[in-house]
Amino acid sequence: MCIRDSQSAEEAAGFLAQHVMYVNPLAVQKVAAEFLENLFDDLEYEEKNRASTGFSLIIHIGFMIERIIANKTIIFDHKTPYLDSNKEIFQKIRSHIKSIEEAFEIEISDDEICYMMITLYPNTYDAAVA
């Protein structure tokens, strides 16, 4: 399934249009969908989960960019043990996320990536910090 052309991506952009001030939702949709297609392929992410997870992540990415532009930060609790337990996933996201950083001229923190990881793999947090 192509995230770029999916109804989920369009719905996410529509949602963002109502809730963000500093970013263009259509630009977020385009860049985030391309990022996700490459990431999903690299992670060998299950096809059946791509649309729903893609929707959630496009919204997360839109709000993330908005936070970064507004100079607001979020903190991810237990970041060090979580990253230690999920290095491979983190490294793949970190390598692909450069496309978003370049498109919007921003730097994305490890904390933001951790929240993406939990959206992709919800069960990884409890296992890592237990």
Feature-to-residue mapping (PLM):
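A cross-family "folded-core" feature that marks the main globular domain of proteins
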Residues: 4-130
